[in-house]
Each structure stands twice: as C-alpha cells, then as structure tokens.
C-alpha cells in the first residue's frame, strides 16, 4: 500500500514542554498548552486547520479541566468544529 492510497495520514506531531510544579507554565491549563502544540503541528505540516479531521490528545490529570479537554485544545488552536477529538488518559 502506498501513502496515496492510505486514508489515514499522520502529518505532524508536537509535544508540550515539560514543566515543574509551580513553574513557568503554572498559569496555563492543559488545553491551552495543547492548543499551542496543535497550532505548531498544523503549521509544521503546512496544512489548513480546517483539513484536520481528528485530534488525539493525551492528558494525564484531566480533573478540573472541564469537559472534553481535547475539544477545548482543538478549538483553541483554530481547528474546525467538525474535527473529531478524543482525550486519552
């Protein structure tokens, strides 16, 4: 199978920085950090934000983040409301 025939394509991956307890990133929520990572991944891949069909978002401690952290991050990154989002614990 060639890439052109495969309907699933991973075009980019980015991770957030590793922070310390009460460090420089303490004012940001996981979805806010995720939005920055998603924006960077989309920019690096050179694709339009509305062409992203799915987001898989890892979140170790989702308590207190509200509903659907993956959805929050995707919308914060400017992706389409039609993008499917899954939060992985």
Model regions: which residues?
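Conserved catalytic cysteine-centered active-site region
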Residues: 28, 59-89
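Short acidic capping loops at alpha-helix termini that bridge into adjacent secondary structure
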Residues: 48-54, 82-84
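Short, well-ordered amphipathic alpha-helical segments that serve as non-catalytic structural scaffolds
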Residues: 31-46, 69-73
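Conserved beta-strand segments that form the floor/walls of ligand-binding pockets within enzyme
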Residues: 9, 56, 87
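Condensing-enzyme catalytic core mediating Claisen C-C bond formation in acyl metabolism
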Residues: 1-31, 40
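N-terminal glycine-rich phosphate/pyrophosphate-binding loops that anchor nucleotide-derived ligands
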Residues: 2, 45, 57-63
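Terminal domain-initiation and capping elements
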Residues: 1-4, 43-45, 76-77
């Amino acid at each position: 199978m060639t890439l052109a025939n495969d309907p699933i394509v991973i075009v980019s991956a980015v991770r957030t920085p590793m922070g310390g307890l009460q460090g420089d990133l303490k004012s940001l929520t996981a979805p806010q950090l995720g939005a920055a990572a998603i924006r960077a991944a989309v920019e690096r891949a050179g694709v339009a934000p509305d062409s992203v069909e799915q987001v898989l978002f890892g979140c170790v401690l989702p308590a207190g983040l509200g509903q659907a952290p993956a959805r929050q991050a995707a919308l914060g990154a400017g992706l389409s409301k039609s993008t499917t989002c899954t939060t992985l614990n």
